[in-house]
Amino acid sequence: MQLSGAEIMCRILAEEGVTTVFGYPGGAILPFYDALRQSPIQHILTAHEQGAAHAADGFARASGKVGVCIATSGPGATNLVTGLATAFLDSVPVVAITGQVNRALIGHDAFQEVDITGITMPITKHNFLVKKPENLTPTLRLAFQLAREGRPGPVLVDVPRDVQTALIDFEEVRLAELQPLEPDAERVAAAAAAINKAQRPVMLVGGGVINANAEYDAMHLCEKLHIPVVSTLMGIGAISAYRQLFLGMTGLHGHERANNAVKEADLILAVGSRFNDRVTGERSSYSANKLIIHLDIDPAEVDKNIDSGIGITGDMVATLNALEKAAQPHDLSSWWDKINSWPGMDDDFGNEEAPKFFKALNPVLKDKDYIITTDVGQHQMWAAQHLKIQFARQWLTSGGLGTMGFGLPAALGAQLARPQSRVISISGDGGFKMTGSELFTIASNNVPVIAIVFNNSGLGMIRQLQTVQFAKRFTACELPGYVDFVKYAAAFGIEGEHADMPEALAQAVAKAWECRKPYLIEVCINPKNMVLPMVAPGLGINDFVKFANDEIN
């Protein structure tokens, strides 16, 4: 049976379980778009290709499936770069399909020709330029397999226009599934023996737990052993914030109890965490006087940032189950007494105004089917500190790259991935201005995202860092001229309101929840608000910066 390359592309996407793609057309990808008309796959036309990449990312994070974004050659493809880098650093399975100029024109500086495979090599798990029509089917199959198996990540497939139009003898190609990597039994036994002897153990859960769908296995292990649990920014949701074993987020803006527990621990069981600099602070003090057991699917991560006493590479579920069988509970009451003497997640750290808005949302959202997406900056840290996330894939944020503008398009993708849920995008005014045009996409497709914009007329985290590190020499941290984001949303036909008190925000979210349509809420806050606790730059994770109240508000 002969099919055009474009028809094969649509067929493979459908067979791989793709129901929705996010994209923006252009000349080099038009044959694919022509074939897509006859396909059952839903196409969402975004306002910008970066929005398409973030939406595919949000779709993947919310569903656990591969997200797909489409762009044409040249500027269309390069506009995907930030989104692909975001997915790469957070290990998100995304397949990006880009059009390319005809094969005979490649290397001749043709109109809208760029070497997108060369550009994206450092920020994709793998990428392909399809040079022969007969390679199209196996390449697409391999792209999906690579994106989702092992450590997930983005894969780009660059398809020349004449490959899309070529008639190809279609042959079904199915790749053998990769078998889960079993953990080394001797290392598991050594880890279990160390856990059994530890007097001050802590489990650290990272984003790898959620990527592996291993959150229940991690929970069963920590409950059996009654071990305190802390999470990285990306691990939020792996263990419910309402569980007594959960101490909070650790890191440079981590909870005091969580950071102190990590500092005082004699053993850290790290599950799916990269130990990046935002988690560890000063590295030598982080690992001093403790044994670190590091579980990860990717051997390249073990001992990369922190030397582990015991490193175990393998399937996360299999490794956690093996540890649960081998490790035994023992008396940790004195350790828990010490932990409970430190300030907890609900204790205030300074005279902060902004966290009250986030705390006010918890009673409204508890036990509801919701997803939170964020941009990057102060609001992201306040949300991570004060929202009580209950489940995996309920918290979607850009942790590795720290991409401003991620939240709104990611919310679009997440809402389409899980229509039964309600997605709430939380942004600052700076990040929202970067991708706020995706309100067009949300409105035109009636996607019921609730967008909350915290407006301090500036770049709050930059202001905070300039306060701490540059003696209040404020530069380029103000966004002069008030923008009324409620009126901006109204221009797209989206209803909204202002909520300048925590109770008003809670009421506005409850109101928006009841109407199954897009809604925007603007919250104006004092630009002097600080994210606290804050670890002093270059110091250990329990070396907190102290502020006087007049510096905070």
Where are these regions (language model features)?
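N-terminal alpha/beta PP-like core and its mobile active-site loop of ThDP/TPP-dependent enzymes
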Residues: 1-327, 364, 448-451, 468-471, ...
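Active-site diphosphate/adenylate-binding microenvironment
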Residues: 9, 14, 27, 32, ...
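Active-site nucleophile and cofactor-binding loops and adjacent substrate-binding regions
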Residues: 24-26, 44-54, 69-76, 131-132, ...
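Thiamine diphosphate
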Residues: 112, 444-536
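Phosphate/pyrophosphate-binding active-site segments
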Residues: 134, 170, 192-193, 289-376, ...
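Short glycine-rich, flexible loops that bind phosphorylated cofactors or substrates
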Residues: 276-278, 381, 528-530
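Hydrophobic, well-ordered secondary-structure elements that form the walls
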Residues: 292, 361, 374, 413, ...
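Catalytic phosphate/nucleotide-handling subdomain of diverse soluble enzymes
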Residues: 406, 410-448, 454
